[in-house]
Amino acid sequence: MQSTANYLWHTDDLLGQGATASVYKARNKKSGELVAVKVFNTTSYLRPREVQVREFEVLRKLNHQNIVKLFAVEETGGSRQKVLVMEYCSSGSLLSVLESPENAFGLPEDEFLVVLRCVVAGMNHLRENGIVHRDIKPGNIMRLVGEEGQSIYKLTDFGAARELDDDEKFVSVYGTEEYLHPDMYERAVLRKPQQKAFGVTVDLWSIGVTLYHAATGSLPFIPFGGPRRNKEIMYRITTEKPAGAIAGAQRRENGPLEWSYTLPITCQLSLGLQSQLVPILANILEVEQAKCWGFDQFFAETSDILQRVVVHVFSLSQAVLHHIYIHAHNTIAIFQEAVHKQTSVAPRHQEYLFEGHLCVLEPSVSAQHIAHTTASSPLTLFSTAIPKGLAFRDPALDVPKFVPKVDLQADYNTAKGVLGAGYQALRLARALLDGQELMFRGLHWVMEVLQATCRRTLEVARTSLLYLSSSLGTERFSSVAGTPEIQELKAAAELRSRLRTLAEVLSRCSQNITETQESLSSLNRELVKSRDQVHEDRSIQQIQCCLDKMNFIYKQFKKSRMRPGLGYNEEQIHKLDKVNFSHLAKRLLQVFQEECVQKYQASLVTHGKRMRVVHETRNHLRLVGCSVAACNTEAQGVQESLSKLLEELSHQLLQDRAKGAQASPPPIAPYPSPTRKDLLLHMQELCEGMKLLASDLLDNNRIIERLNRVPAPPDV
């Protein structure tokens, strides 16, 4: 045990160790509160006095939630070594998070954004206080879990930090070589003499490498054999990097340098976030200081990302989930353009559903009016795009092979790589199942909308047909129309014949809609059956079971690698563990390929066929709806003409009757008196009936107009 006046710790509770100090987990003697103590060794006292006290002075100036707090500076009892008492971060460092096999291909998007927010806030506080850190790397970013379960990242280890204004330079070299600015790397690692001075932007390069590492799980610049074994090529990669490139690698010995301008496909970040992040990385991983961004622009651009909101959009036709990053104050038009950029679906062709309901977005309205979405509850984009599906790299391509002999360190590294690929397979399997669920749900919603359209259009058609049938079936009209001597009645008979034709068209439309309803119901039953099969899928559980067993063996390898060697029996167990581990990995990848990928690809093909049927059905319903509307419009016109004709005929008969009553002696009537009287009565009743029918047809037309206001998709 060691102690100071107020704190004590056991030397076994080592948290980290460097060239000049060791960090231990300690406790407050009075309260029992856990803290971290940094105990400086004898080597640290060989440094100049100014350098020794610099870390204390820097930490005393800082007070921010994203920087590890300094509680006290004390001394050990016997040797009187200086001790920094600091905030204890119980969840390790960002490096330990990235070293976990679950994060072998980088952090999930939400966690990466937390890292970005914390690092930017912490660096901004340093800059406000005129301090350059000079050793930014994942190992110097500590993690703490907050009360609500969220991660909080804090900058630590200010042993290399010093006060420096924007226009000042320094010449001393600090830092960890993989994260060093190329100019500092040349001097510190390659030991090449140079007269260059360094400014505050050296931290930007280190931040760029750190962010790339957090996003992908690997370093951006990798020479053949690794950065520590091939230092000259490492320097070449960083200094010869073309503008816009964010990574470089040498795949084989003496091979060419290959450049990357995008993040790898294995990265967990969405394309929406990648499109915002890549330009930042390209401009801070810039060796020429004249071209490299300054802190002001870096803070402005990263703050722009962090201030954006995410709208989750599932392109139903493409079967792809998109993350659209926009500002809350942006208009819907800007949102639609962002969707267009990722999906290639033009704004005028974008239709949205949310939780089963049509979601009409007005371009001029603020994006704040968009419903809150999540990855499992996104806006569903309906368009005529061709299915693409989730793009991914087969995890089997990233599975390393065990060496035949027993090599504890090599076996551990291999197991770690295989386990990382296994976790990637698990993530992809979940994404494939989630994608199928979103396909089924979106298709079900679209078919529900089409069924509702069928019901409304059918109601309009049947109502119009009922009115027409009622009018055409009246005996009074038949008796009146049977009087051929009156020319107007011949015209009325022709109009009546046209109404009969329209009634036949409406009848066919009604039958057509009924058949469409049956077709949609059949497709929906098929969809429910497919959805149930996906819900019964147990591939995720099988993969997880393999991973749990592999994890147990991996932990055994992790313990063994620290030992100098194994006894005979232990070595035999180790060999069996390697065999079992390989079998489990093979089984895991087999389940992924046969139960996940193949079923997903088959589902994608079926989805494409169903989408074509849905688009054809929708276009067909539009045509039927137009036919019903046209019939209603024409029937309304015919009814109005018929009503006007009968009204004129009724008026003429009234005039003839009045003239006949005044004449003496009464002339011989062209028609028998009873017929004239009945005819007049029938005309008046028919006029009223025609007016009512025309009014009903007008109401139907208004209903159809409202139906047609729903935006229509482009023609297939």
Swiss-Prot record:
Gene Ontology CC terms, in alphabetical order: cytoplasm; cytosol; mitochondrial membrane; nucleoplasm; nucleus; PML body; serine/threonine protein kinase complex
UniProt source species: Homo sapiens (Human)
Residues binding ATP: 15-23, 38
Cross-link (Glycyl lysine isopeptide (Lys-Gly) (interchain with G-Cter in ubiquitin)): 30, 401
One Pfam family named in its UniProt record: TBK1_CCD1
Molecular-function annotations in GO: ATP binding; identical protein binding; IkappaB kinase activity; K48-linked polyubiquitin modification-dependent protein binding; protein phosphatase binding; protein serine/threonine kinase activity; ubiquitin protein ligase binding
Effect of residue 416 to R: No effect on ubiquitination
Subunit structure: Homodimer. Interacts with MAVS/IPS1. Interacts (via protein kinase domain) with TTLL12 (via N-terminus); the interaction prevents MAVS binding to IKBKE. Interacts with the adapter proteins AZI2/NAP1, TANK and TBKBP1/SINTBAD. Interacts with SIKE1. Interacts with TICAM1/TRIF, IRF3 and RIGI; interactions are disrupted by the interaction between IKBKE and SIKE1. Interacts with TOPORS; induced by DNA damage. Interacts with CYLD. Interacts (when polyubiquitinated) with IKBKB, IKBKG and MYD88. Interacts with IFIH1. Interacts with DDX3X; the interaction may be induced upon virus infection. (Microbial infection) Interacts (via Protein kinase domain) with arenavirus protein N; the interaction inhibits IKBKE kinase function.
Top EC class of this enzyme: transferase
UniProt entry tagged with the keyword Chloroplast: no
This protein's name: Inhibitor of nuclear factor kappa-B kinase subunit epsilon
Result of changing residue 416 to A: No effect on ubiquitination
Catalytic activity: L-seryl-[I-kappa-B protein] + ATP = O-phospho-L-seryl-[I-kappa-B protein] + ADP + H(+)
Protein kinase domain span: 9-315
Resulting phenotype, residue 231 to R: Loss of sumoylation and loss of targeting to nuclear bodies
Active site: 135 (proton acceptor)
Organism phylogeny: Eukaryota, Metazoa, Chordata, Craniata, Vertebrata
Family under the similarity heading: Belongs to the protein kinase superfamily. Ser/Thr protein kinase family. I-kappa-B kinase subfamily.
Main location: cytoplasm
SUPFAM superfamilies reported in the protein's UniProt record: Protein kinase-like (PK-like)
Localization: Cytoplasm; Nucleus; Nucleus, PML body
